[in-house]
Amino acid sequence: MGVGGNFWDLLRPYAQQQGFDFLRNKRVAVDLSFWIVQHETAVKGFVLKPHLRLTFFRTINLFSKFGAYPVFVVDGTPSPLKSQARISRFFRSSGIDTCNLPVIKDGVSVERNKLFSEWVRECVELLELLGIPVLKANGEAEALCAQLNSQGFVDACITPDSDAFLFGAMCVIKDIKPNSREPFECYHMSHIESGLGLKRKHLIAISLLVGNDYDSGGVLGIGVDKALRIVREFSEDQVLERLQDIGNGLQPAVPGGIKSGDDGEEFRSEMKKRSPHCSRCGHLGSKRTHFKSSCEHCGCDSGCIKKPLGFRCECSFCSKDRDLREQKKTNDWWIKVCDKIALAPEFPNRKIIELYLSDGLMTGDGSSMSWGTPDTGMLVDLMVFKLHWDPSYVRKMLLPMLSTIYLREKARNNTGYALLCDQYEFHSIKCIKTRYGHQSFVIRWRKPKSTSGYSHSHSEPEESIVVLEEEEESVDPLDGLNEPQVQNDNGDCFLLTDECIGLVQSAFPDETEHFLHEKKLRESKKKNVSEEETATPRATTMGVQRSITDFYRSAKKAAAGQSIETGGSSKASAEKKRQATSTSSSNLTKSVRRRLLFG
């Protein structure tokens, strides 16, 4: 998908590794089709409707854990140009001879798979109930994602299609992994421009040469490396026009490259003017001359010095000789490349260029995007009907998203306190939790006995200590959520959720300051106690396991004492016995000793 020829490998050195907080408070455009297709093969048959489950969990993770404002984009009617490329790709992957490819009529688009379209419709229904904006593109979803990014409606795009850069994207994220400590790759167009010296039209030119979603073949015999060398010779304003000239059979004048006519005669005439060089040292002059009189370049009193491995003469002729050879090599390379491009039919395809440079990919104004509140009742009905989930499970899984909305509203205008079904209110900060290398507050949400008014307590629970919870990375292909914990304390019901530290601090600054102050006091007290224990170590401590010899008499000690007393006598007797045995054995014949030894 996207530009062919391992195009991502060309861009990977300029990727930035970003963590959880990079997307916080940022608007991101998501290619919904990518999420649906990504894990369909891996989990197909193991869970019911994996596309709905994945979209549900990933959206909540993106909204609550990453703190982003997602905008989902779905594909519209595909371009007729892509229909032929899709059929060709299917034939090659299936091992079918491409000579039997059906011909698509001009201007006719092949409709997408009906089952896949049904999956998209179900996911759109789910997202709308979650209050997430969904946009439909006039063509490709990655094209609309790129347009939203280039026009400033979103801050980044989440799509694996590398042709998002060709459509004008400024920041592209290939994929996110909520349940992993590994950072995700983020590509900025500004870094690509400074690193490779390529701009948007340069990338379009590379895609025309190596292949793309609309022309999977490209130019035969040209890969990413050759395409990069070609487009670097032209400016952004000229590169597409120069490719048009080459496709028409014209060979443009490239600096340091092609010259008109054949320069072979000039090169051979230069070779005839070659001055003699010593075969021993490589400098000007013959070997015989250097033996008669020393070489002035070697600096010897007599003769010359044998040239080292890889020696290069720097005289004017040799330098010019190397330049001419390099010029000839470059000329030959450019002639071959231009011939390959000229043989490609209808190169470059102007319709593909216009498609990449088009901005009319969206119906309406992107500024009308808005994020609403989830319709809990309808969501419960949908998930119970589609996935056969328990209603209480659906509400629990929605809690991280609802709590994030609550904290954002609280931080924005300091009003409103109902969290979920007007039942839970902010109670306290339990602890700091570290998971996958990311710190968050564990918040206790209380369901009061009376909901007539809002109140919160500064009192810290007994478990209000800093907890560092390092868990193994999840292998769940559907990026499932952790089910919120439920606690009962003195008749009150508490729900525990993980929340962003900065968001909680903005919503409840006093409670956060109180918690951090108490945490600091506990740490200083713990440090003082440890310093006192280090300064005055005790013989026995409650935290040190005692040896079993402190409770029972050791037989080894008594045996060791006896061995010290009898050590000398036993050694002497053993020595006498050994000498007697050796003496008696020496008097026996060899055959007798063998029978005694082996029986």
Curated annotation (Swiss-Prot):
Residues where Mg(2+) 2 binds: 161, 163, 213
Region listing for N-domain, in residue ranges: 1-96
Enzyme Commission number: 3.1.-.-
GO CC annotation terms, alphabetical: nucleus
Residue ranges of the region described as I-domain: 128-217
Gene Ontology BP terms: DNA repair; UV protection
Location of the region described as XPG-N domain in the Swiss-Prot/TrEMBL record: 2-95
Any Pfam family hit: XPG_N
Region described as XPG-I domain: spans on this chain: 128-213
Cofactor note: Binds 2 magnesium ions per subunit. They probably participate in the reaction catalyzed by the enzyme. May bind an additional third magnesium ion after substrate binding.
Annotated segments matching region 5'-3' exonuclease domain: 213-407
Function: Endonuclease which cleaves flap structures at the junction between single-stranded DNA and double-stranded DNA with a specific cleavage site in the 5' overhang strand exactly one nucleotide 3' of the branch point. Structure- and sequence-specific nuclease that resolves holliday junctions (HJs) by symmetrically oriented incisions in two opposing strands near the junction point, thus leading to ligatable products; HJs are physical links between homologous DNA molecules that arise as central intermediary structures during homologous recombination and repair in meiotic and somatic cells.
Family statement drawn from the similarity comment of this UniProt entry: Belongs to the XPG/RAD2 endonuclease family. GEN subfamily.
Protein name: Flap endonuclease GEN-like 1
